């Protein structure tokens, strides 16, 4: 959509423009049998024209009456505006802009906008090639002329998505993706939508994204729609249909490996009784391995569950990747021999590296392959679920680290004590050596000092005689 603007430049009074639109609609409908729109609204337009020509400022009560009469005129004009889709291609945009301008002068524009958006979401017979782009341009104008907090934007946005969905316009959807990623959540909060409207909006985005070929965005918004279902509605038929759609998408889309958003959904949990086989398959993909999957499909063929047989290869490949992720997360030594991987995945040994690389690309593990040692050294592995067994594994690893740290601390403590002992011994030895050297030096000084004092006294005595 274009940069937001609240300006739509059209000159003329309400009565003049409404009369012009009525004549134009009557012209388009000239081959139809309906009565004249202009004739229907003429009495109300005469009253409005008198009030518009009055030089006196209308009082509050008069202003309310003006708005009421405008609304009555607009009810007839907006219903008749469905004919604008048959207008010549060059005139469609101008005609709808006139409708938008008139609607904005009503007491409640939101009363009319959903119907206008519904018209714009339908094809333009006069412009089969450029009709969708014209409709998107007009809808963008409506969206941008509304205040950001106006919840009428919700209906306009649904119409934009409907046009993209019906035309499979990849270019239009790509232009919208940035706003979907950056602004949709804030729009939902600003428009103050209830759960049903939030669900409807996310499903509209999901459908448009799927038509445009963006399966990942489509799946993400299906999950968001699923999460918008209130617990009180989780067992309804609509919730069950959406839950089945989300679950089948998660199983068959090759990029989905995290099933937590599904298992935490009340609507999905209700499938435990409504779709027991499908729910059991989800539990296998969420936390089990290839062995459990192969046992399951022996007793419950994929063809018996919503045509999943068509995706049998995708399901098996995904299960192999998930099994390898579980294997990497549970190995205590962080080293996975090629033979162990080959056995767990039911694949030839020479294919091990391919499957490890696929699992790395899926973001489930990180590590280093060693062809020389025939092993995969795990640097990081993602737990598919985190329950009692995983906590036990973490506890075991923490105990190993604790013992290792205790051993390191023991070595450090021993070395510290040894260092202190050696330091004390060295200090004592240095002190003892210093005492012995001092004693020898003192005796020599005394001997030298005694001879020096006797000489002078003898000289003094001789000199005295």
UniProtKB/Swiss-Prot annotation:
One GO BP annotation of this record: formation of cytoplasmic translation initiation complex
Main location: cytoplasm
Family label: Belongs to the eIF-3 subunit M family.
GO cellular component, as recorded: eukaryotic 43S preinitiation complex; eukaryotic 48S preinitiation complex; eukaryotic translation initiation factor 3 complex, eIF3m
Ranges where the record places region Disordered: 429-465
Compartmental location: Cytoplasm
GO molecular function terms attached to this record: translation initiation factor activity
Role, per record: Component of the eukaryotic translation initiation factor 3 (eIF-3) complex, which is involved in protein synthesis of a specialized repertoire of mRNAs and, together with other initiation factors, stimulates binding of mRNA and methionyl-tRNAi to the 40S ribosome. The eIF-3 complex specifically targets and initiates translation of a subset of mRNAs involved in cell proliferation.
Name the UniProt record assigns to this protein: Eukaryotic translation initiation factor 3 subunit M
Keyword field contains Ligase: no
Subunit note: Component of the eukaryotic translation initiation factor 3 (eIF-3) complex.
Domain of life (superkingdom): Eukaryota
The keyword Protein biosynthesis appears for this protein: yes
Pfam family, one: PCI
Ranges of compositional bias, category Basic and acidic residues: 433-448, 455-465
Protein keywords: Cytoplasm, Initiation factor, Protein biosynthesis
Domain PCI: 215-383
């Amino acid at each position: 959509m274009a940069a937001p603007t609240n300006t739509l430049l059209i000159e003329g009074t309400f009565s003049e423009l409404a009369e012009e639109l009525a004549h134009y609609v009557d012209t388009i409908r000239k081959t139809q049998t309906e009565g004249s729109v202009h004739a229907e609204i003429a009495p109300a337009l005469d009253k409005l024209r008198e009030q518009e020509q009055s030089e006196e400022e209308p009082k509050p009560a008069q202003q309310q009456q003006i708005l009421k009469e405008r609304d009555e005129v607009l009810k007839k004009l907006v219903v008749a505006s469905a004919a604008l889709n048959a207008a010549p291609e060059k005139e469609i945009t101008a005609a709808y802009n006139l409708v938008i301008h008139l609607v904005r002068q009503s007491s409640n524009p939101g009363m009319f906008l959903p119907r206008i958006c519904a018209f714009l979401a339908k094809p333009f017979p006069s412009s089969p090639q450029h009709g969708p782009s014209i409709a998107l341009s007009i809808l963008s104008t409506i969206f941008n002329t509304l205040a950001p907090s106006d919840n009428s934007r919700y209906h306009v946005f649904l119409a934009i998505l409907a046009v993209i969905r019906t035309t499979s316009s990849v270019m239009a959807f790509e232009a919208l993706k940035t706003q979907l990623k950056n602004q949709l959540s804030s729009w939902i909060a600003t428009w103050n939508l209830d759960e049903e409207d939030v669900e409807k909006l996310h499903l509209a985005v999901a459908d448009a994204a799927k038509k445009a070929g963006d399966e990942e965005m489509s799946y993400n918004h299906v999950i968001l729609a699923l999460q918008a279902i209130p617990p009180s509605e989780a067992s309804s038929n609509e919730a069950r249909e959406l839950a089945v759609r989300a679950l089948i998408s998660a199983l068959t889309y090759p990029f989905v490996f995290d099933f937590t958003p599904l298992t935490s959904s009340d609507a999905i949990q209700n499938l435990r009784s409504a779709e027991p086989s499908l729910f059991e398959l989800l539990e296998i993909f969420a936390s089990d391995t290839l062995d459990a999957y192969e046992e399951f499909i022996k007793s419950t063929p994929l063809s018996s569950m919503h045509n999943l047989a068509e995706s049998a290869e995708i399901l098996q490949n995904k299960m192999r990747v998930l099994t390898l992720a579980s294997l990497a997360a549970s190995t205590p030594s962080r080293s996975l021999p090629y033979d162990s991987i080959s056995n767990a995945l039911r694949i030839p040994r020479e294919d091990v590296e391919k499957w490890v690389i696929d699992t790395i690309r899926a973001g489930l593990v990180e590590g280093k392959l060693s062809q020389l040692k025939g092993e995969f050294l795990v640097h990081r592995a993602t737990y598919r679920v985190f329950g009692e067994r995983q906590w036990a594994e973490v506890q075991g690893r923490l105990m190993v680290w604790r013992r290792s740290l205790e051993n390191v601390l023991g070595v450090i403590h021993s070395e510290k004590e040894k260092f202190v002992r050696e330091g004390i011994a060295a200090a004592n030895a240095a002190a003892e050596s210093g005492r012995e050297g001092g004693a020898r030096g003192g005796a020599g000084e005394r001997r030298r000092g005694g001879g020096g004092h006797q000489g002078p006294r003898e000289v003094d005595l001789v000199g005295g005689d």
